[in-house]
Curated annotation (Swiss-Prot):
It is found in: Cytoplasm. One of its GO terms (molecular function) is DNA binding. NCBIfam families: PRK05298.1 (NF003673), uvrb (TIGR00631). Residues 430-592 form the Helicase C-terminal domain. CDD domains: DEXHc_UvrB (cd17916), SF2_C_UvrB (cd18790). This is UvrABC system protein B. Gene3D superfamilies: P-loop containing nucleotide triphosphate hydrolases, UVR domain. PROSITE patterns: HELICASE_ATP_BIND_1, HELICASE_CTER, UVR. Residues 25-414 form the Helicase ATP-binding domain. The gene is uvrB. GO terms for cellular component: cytoplasm; excinuclease repair complex.
Length: 661
C-alpha cells in the first residue's frame, strides 16, 4: 500500500504542530466534525497536508469555486509529488440548462461546452480512487451533483494482461461499450485504432500517453505505453485497466431495463396529463420521450440522457443520486475549505435545481424522474460525508454548531507577520484621501488593493485613477481564470500598482507586495461589509510586515467593531509569540513563479531567434508541435502562467514559420 509522503523543506511551526495534533486526536477519537480556524498566512494548506500524511487516509478537499480549488490542487501537488493528487470540478466551460418560461411560452434548449482537459482530470480522479489509497481529490462544490454509479463504472472496466487471450472482436466491442470511438485516422483521447496485430488505445484519463496492445493471434504479447504525438515508447506495462470514456457507461442489459422503466413511467404520466385535460403537454411529452427511447434503443444514449439517470442506476424515486462521495472509501477524510462560503452553497444547490425542473415536468418537457437527476440535498450530504474538518478564518454558524463551538485555532504565523493595523477614516471625501494614501504606499514600492460596493463605482474609480496616470487595473467576475492570473502577476511584478475590485476577498488574493487595503464605504452594512467579509478583506494585507488597512466610514457599525476586535485579538497573540521567541516579522518573499520564464515574450527577439535557431523548417515545425504539447500539459496541471508563456511563444514561432515558408 502506498503511503502519503510530504516533500518539503519546511516543517510545521507556529500554531501548526499543536493544531495538527489536536485535529488528529479528534479523528482518532471518532469525532465526526472539527473546526480549524486558520487565518491568512498561517499555513492552512500545509497543516492539512500534514494531517493527511499522519492519518494516511484517502482525502477529499472541497472548495467553493474552481479558482480556489485550482490553487489548493497546485499546492498539494507540489507537497505530495509522489502521490495521486487529483482535480475534480465541473467540466463545463459554458452551461445553459434547459428551462421553460411559462409566462412567455419560451423553451430554452440545453447548451453547453465541455472542457476536455477537465473531463480528463475527472476521469483521472475516479480512476485513482478505485485503484489506490494514496489519493487526494481537490474538488469544487459541484462534486455533490450526480455521477455515474461507481459499481457500474468499475464493473465495465476492461482488464488487460500480457500472456492472456482476448478474442479480437470481443475486445473491440468491449471498447465500444466503454464509449471509446474507433478512429484509425485521427488519434485522440477516448479513441482506439487498429493497425495489423496492434490495437492502440488513448485512455480517457491521459492527455500525453497511450497504450499499444501487441497480439499474436488472440494472445496479448505486450502492452507498451507510448507518446501519441511522436510514437516513442515510454514504458512496458505488466497490466492495464481501461475505464469508461464516460462516467455513465453501462452494460446493454442495464440499458434495456432502463428503457422498460422509462416506458412504464411515460404511460403513467400520459394518463395523468390526460386526466388533467392537458392535450398539449400530453402530446409534447410523448413526442420528446419516444424520440429519446428510439435513440437509447439504437445507440445506448440520447441527448439529455442524465434526466433518465435514476433508471440506469437502479435508484428509487426520491433516493439520492450516486455522486463522487460514493467513490470514496469508508475511511476517507473530508476537508471543507472556506466553509463559511462552501456550506451555504451546498445548502442552496438542491432548491435552485428543483425549482427549474418542476416547471419542465409540469409542462410536459420531462418525466417526473428528471427530478432525481439533481445535486444532493443538504441532509443527504450530511449523511454521506465522512469525518470532516471544516477550515475557515471566519467559521459560519453551522460549523460552530456541529463542532460544539470547539475550535482548533491556527493563528500564529511561523513568519511572525502580524495582522495588519486597521485605521478608520471619514467616508466623506474618501477618494481624495485615498489618492494621498496611494502616493505614499507606491513610494515605498508596495501595491494597493481597493474594494468598492458596486461595479459602477469600481469602473469609475479605475478610470479616474488611470486619468491621473496611476497604473491601475480592475478585477471582476467576467475575467477568465488565465487573464485573472496574468493581472495578479502584473500586480506583483509592478506592471500594475493598484487593483480595484468589488469583492476582493472572493478572489483569494495573496499578494505579499500589498502594503495597503482600502475599504470604501465600510459602514454600509450588508454582505460586502459584514463582519466575515471585513475580516477576510483585512486579511489581504496580512502578508506584508508594513501592511495597513483603511476603512472609510462615517459611523462605527457592529460589523466594523467585531472585525477590528478580532483582528486586534489575533495581532496581540502574534505579538506575544514573537516577543517570546525573538521573532522579527518579515514580509513573505514568495517567488512570482519563475519571473524570468513568465515575462511576456518580445516578439521581434523571438522571430530573430526562430530564424537563427530553426533555419530548418522541419525542425521549426517539430519544435512548435512540442511547445503545443507542453502548453497542454501545463494547462492540465493548472500551471496557467506557464501555459500562457508557452502560448505567447507559440504565437511568435508560428509567425516565424509563416515567414520562413
Amino acid at each position: 500500500m502506498n503511503n502519503f509522503s510530504i516533500i518539503s523543506e519546511y516543517k510545521p511551526a507556529g500554531d501548526q504542530p499543536k493544531a495538527i495534533d489536536e485535529i488528529i486526536a479528534g479523528l482518532n477519537s471518532k469525532k465526526r466534525s472539527q473546526m480549524l480556524l486558520g487565518i491568512t498566512g498561517s499555513g492552512k494548506t500545509f497543516t492539512m497536508a500534514n494531517i493527511i500524511e499522519r492519518t494516511n487516509r484517502p482525502t477529499l478537499i472541497m472548495a467553493h469555486n474552481k479558482t480556489l480549488a485550482a490553487q489548493i490542487y497546485s499546492e498539494m501537488k507540489s507537497i505530495f509529488p509522489k502521490n495521486a493528487v487529483e482535480y475534480f470540478v465541473s467540466y463545463y466551460d459554458y452551461y445553459q440548462p434547459e428551462a421553460y418560461i411559462a409566462r412567455t411560452d419560451t423553451f430554452i434548449e440545453k447548451d453547453s461546452s465541455i472542457n476536455e482537459q477537465i473531463d480528463l482530470m475527472r476521469h483521472s480522479a475516479t480512476r485513482s480512487l478505485l485503484e489506490r489509497r494514496d489519493v487526494i481529490v481537490v474538488s469544487s462544490v459541484s462534486c455533490i451533483y450526480g455521477l455515474g454509479s461507481p459499481d457500474l463504472y468499475y464493473q465495465m472496466t476492461v482488464n488487460l494482461e500480457p500472456g492472456k487471450s482476448y478474442p479480437r472482436d470481443k475486445l473491440l466491442n468491449d471498447l465500444i461499450n466503454l464509449q471509446y470511438e474507433r478512429n484509425d485516422i485521427g488519434f485522440e483521447r477516448g479513441c482506439f485504432r487498429v493497425k495489423g496485430d496492434n490495437i492502440d488505445i488513448f485512455p480517457s484519463h491521459y492527455s500525453d500517453k497511450a497504450w499499444r496492445l501487441s497480439f499474436f493471434g488472440n494472445e496479448l504479447e505486450y502492452i507498451h505505453e507510448f507518446d501519441p504525438l511522436t510514437g516513442e515508447k515510454l514504458a512496458k506495462l505488466d497490466k492495464a485497466m481501461v475505464f469508461g470514456n464516460s462516467h455513465f457507461v453501462m452494460p446493454q442489459e442495464t440499458v434495456n431495463s432502463a428503457i422498460s422503466g422509462i416506458e412504464e413511467e411515460l404511460q403513467k404520466r400520459l394518463e395523468f396529463l390526460k386526466s388533467q385535460d392537458k392535450p398539449l403537454e400530453t402530446q409534447r411529452l410523448n413526442q420528446r420521450t419516444q424520440y429519446d427511447l428510439e435513440m437509447l434503443t439504437e445507440t445506448g444514449s440520447c441527448k439529455g440522457v442524465e434526466n433518465y439517470s435514476r433508471f440506469f442506476t437502479g435508484r428509487n424515486a426520491g433516493e439520492p443520486p450516486p455522486t463522487l462521495f460514493e467513490y470514496l472509501p469508508e475511511d476517507a477524510l473530508l476537508f471543507v475549505d472556506e466553509s463559511h462560503v462552501s456550506v451555504p452553497q451546498i445548502r442552496a444547490m438542491y432548491n435552485g435545481d428543483r425549482a427549474r425542473k418542476e416547471v419542465l415536468v409540469e409542462h410536459g418537457f420531462r418525466l417526473p424522474s428528471a427530478l432525481d437527476n439533481r445535486p444532493l440535498k443538504f441532509e443527504e450530504w450530511e449523511k454521506f460525508r465522512p469525518q470532516t474538518v471544516f477550515v475557515s478564518a471566519t467559521p459560519g454558524p453551522f460549523e460552530l454548531e456541529e463542532t460544539g463551538d470547539t475550535v482548533v485555532e491556527l493563528i500564529i504565523r511561523p513568519t511572525g507577520l502580524l495582522d495588519p493595523e486597521c485605521i478608520i477614516k471619514p467616508a466623506t471625501n474618501q477618494v481624495e484621501d485615498l489618492i494621498g494614501e496611494i502616493q505614499a504606499t507606491i513610494a515605498k514600492g508596495f501595491r494597493v488593493l481597493v474594494t468598492t460596493l458596486t461595479k459602477k463605482m469600481a469602473e469609475d474609480l479605475t478610470a479616474y485613477l488611470q486619468e491621473l496616470k496611476y497604473k491601475t487595473s480592475y478585477l471582476h467576475s467576467n475575467i477568465h481564470t488565465l487573464e485573472r492570473i496574468e493581472i495578479l502577476r502584473d500586480l506583483r511584478q509592478g506592471t500594475i500598482d493598484i487593483l480595484v475590485g468589488i469583492n476582493l476577498l472572493r478572489e483569494g488574493l495573496d499578494i505579499p507586495e500589498c502594503g495597503l487595503v482600502a475599504i470604501l464605504d465600510a459602514d454600509k452594512e450588508g454582505f460586502l461589509r459584514s463582519e466575515v467579509s471585513l475580516i477576510q478583506t483585512i486579511g489581504r494585507a496580512a502578508r506584508n510586515s508594513e501592511g495597513r488597512v483603511i476603512l472609510y466610514a462615517d459611523k462605527m457599525t457592529k460589523s466594523i467593531d467585531k472585525a477590528m476586535s478580532e483582528t486586534s485579538r489575533r495581532r496581540q497573540i502574534q505579538q506575544e509569540y514573537n516577543e517570546k521567541h525573538g521573532i522579527i516579522p518579515k514580509t513573505i518573499n514568495r517567488a512570482i513563479h519563475a519571473l524570468a520564464e513568465l515575462e511576456k515574450v518580445d516578439s521581434k527577439l523571438d522571430k530573430k531567434q526562430a530564424h537563427t535557431l530553426f533555419d530548418n523548417p522541419a525542425k521549426l515545425k517539430a519544435h512548435i508541435e512540442k511547445l503545443k504539447k507542453d502548453m497542454l500539459k501545463a494547462a492540465s496541471n493548472l500551471e496557467f502562467e506557464q501555459a500562457a508563456k508557452l502560448r505567447d511563444q507559440l504565437k511568435t514561432l508560428e509567425e516565424a514559420a509563416l515567414e520562413l515558408s
